Design a protein with these regions (language model features):
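A glycine-rich beta-strand to alpha-helix segment
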Residues: 118-150
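A short, gly/pro- and small-residue-rich
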Residues: 100-107, 146-154
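Nucleotide phosphate-binding/pyrophosphate-handling subdomain across enzymes
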Residues: 1-81
């Protein structure tokens, strides 16, 4: 048992460390509900006190975004800076008027809505995110390797 526990690398996409250096800490997580985001951000802030926390969040499902928009805004306000990607639809058709900007409009913290993933990579290349978190249940995980490489090459 001891050998198995020591070899356990954790659960993929649950507070998964993608890069840890003196300058950057990058974590990826599957969080896609306001309570999960709240726990994720609070946990990261506790572990990395004093580091500026930037969250890149991709909402998952139009209906969930509509139903929990206030909760998402409240949870994301716990970060210092937030970048919102477009909603990942999964199995749903778009709901008129439901978009990531709904969350952004309710937030008090510095935030921006990016139209695509390439914009996120450009932003990371131009900034110095001390504690970076990507979160969401959509296809945001397809960005993790590119983000890691962008940070590693700074």
């Amino acid at each position: 048992i001891r050998e198995a526990v020591s070899a356990f690398k954790g659960v993929k996409r649950r507070f998964e460390y993608k890069l840890v250096t003196e300058r950057f800490t990058y974590v990826d997580d599957y969080a896609h509900h306001p309570e999960e985001l709240k726990a994720l951000i609070n946990g990261a802030r506790d572990m990395f006190r004093g580091k500026k926390c930037t969250v890149i969040f991709q909402p998952h499902l139009y209906s969930r975004t509509r139903d929990f928009v206030k909760g998402f805004a409240e949870s994301l306000n716990l970060a210092d800076e937030v970048i919102l990607l477009p909603i990942y639809p999964a199995r749903e058709e778009p709901i008129p008027g439901v978009e990531s900007k709904m969350i952004s409009d309710l937030m008090k913290k510095s935030n921006r809505v990016m139209e695509n993933k390439a914009s996120v990579l450009q932003w990371i290349d131009e900034h110095e995110p001390e504690l970076l978190i990507t979160a969401g249940a959509g296809d945001i995980d397809q960005l993790t390797e590119k983000i890691t490489n962008t940070l590693r090459n700074k």
